Amino acid sequence: MSTLDEVLALLRTIAPSGDETELTADTLLFSSGLLDSLALEELHVAIEERWAPIPPMELARANFDTPAAIAATVARITHEETPVSVVRNLLSDSGRLTADLAPDAMGAGAQLLFDTWHAGGTTLSCGNGGSASTASHFAADLAKLTIVPGQRRMRTLCLNDNASAFSAWTNDEGFPVVYREQAEPWLEPTATLVAFSVHGGSRGGEVSANLPAVARLAKERGAAVVAVTGFDGGALGDLADVHINIPHATEPVATPLIESLHVLVHHALCVAHAP
């Protein structure tokens, strides 16, 4: 029996009686509400009894949110997983997810960018953390790679590039409004907002609340919204006119893997308009 099969069997003993949910490797356990915090504590105890003590660094909930993630955690704490196997699995997942990318969604996103350029509008971008660097990189590439001599250039603006404005709005009004307020003068019906986010922001509004906030303003103004996300897309994916999603949810590799593929997506959006 594989470690994953053992984990699935263990989870079936922890799941509430009467729950007929079919558990798979990527079933969301805690973020979906399928299991609660008491079940998480019970899971920790069961893992330590069955396998080995869990180091503090492994106790982040993200490491236990899917059966596959739990199996990966068990492999690490029992030393079944080596650096080489981690890299090999990361590259394998990267190839599979790249092959599964939806070209139609990326084509639709590229068309919105063309429509914005044709109408003389501005393409705005934003993100948090690593996704902020992707948003900045995207704005630079979209402005430079698409230059055609004699033609009007694409107008781009990355909302997380102005550190002074970012800190001023955060300090004075709060983090949730930091992009909305900067985008306010630019969001017209001719504009497109491209937002990058690994999780897409929580639907409850607590995590990455600045992204759904600026997306809602864009929708109110008649601007288009392109969301480039991972996991299930979150609140940002729900608001998007075009949603480009990397449906991976197994930490600790999910976040870096999704961020890497987001760079591929942003390059595809830019190359679609390259001369």
Curated annotation (Swiss-Prot):
InterPro entries associated with the record: ACP-like_sf, GmhA/DiaA, PP-bd_ACP, SIS_dom, SIS_dom_sf, SIS_GmhA/DiaA_subfam
UniProt entry tagged with the keyword Phosphoprotein: yes
Pathway(s) it belongs to: Antibiotic biosynthesis; lincomycin biosynthesis
Modified residues (O-(pantetheine 4'-phosphoryl)serine): S37
Domain Carrier: 1-78
Pfam families named among the record's database cross-references: SIS_2 (PF13580)
SIS domain segment(s): 113-275
GO biological process annotation, one example: carbohydrate derivative metabolic process
Alphabetical list of Gene3D superfamilies matching this protein: ACP-like, Glucose-6-phosphate isomerase like protein, domain 1
Keywords annotated in UniProt: Antibiotic biosynthesis, Phosphopantetheine, Phosphoprotein
Highest taxon above the source species: Bacteria
Molecular functions per Gene Ontology: carbohydrate derivative binding
Record-linked PANTHER family: SEDOHEPTULOSE 7-PHOSPHATE ISOMERASE / DNAA INITIATOR-ASSOCIATING FACTOR FOR REPLICATION INITIATION, SUGAR ISOMERASE (SIS)
Protein name, per record: Lincomycin biosynthesis protein LmbN
Naturally occurring in which organism (per UniProt): Streptomyces lincolnensis
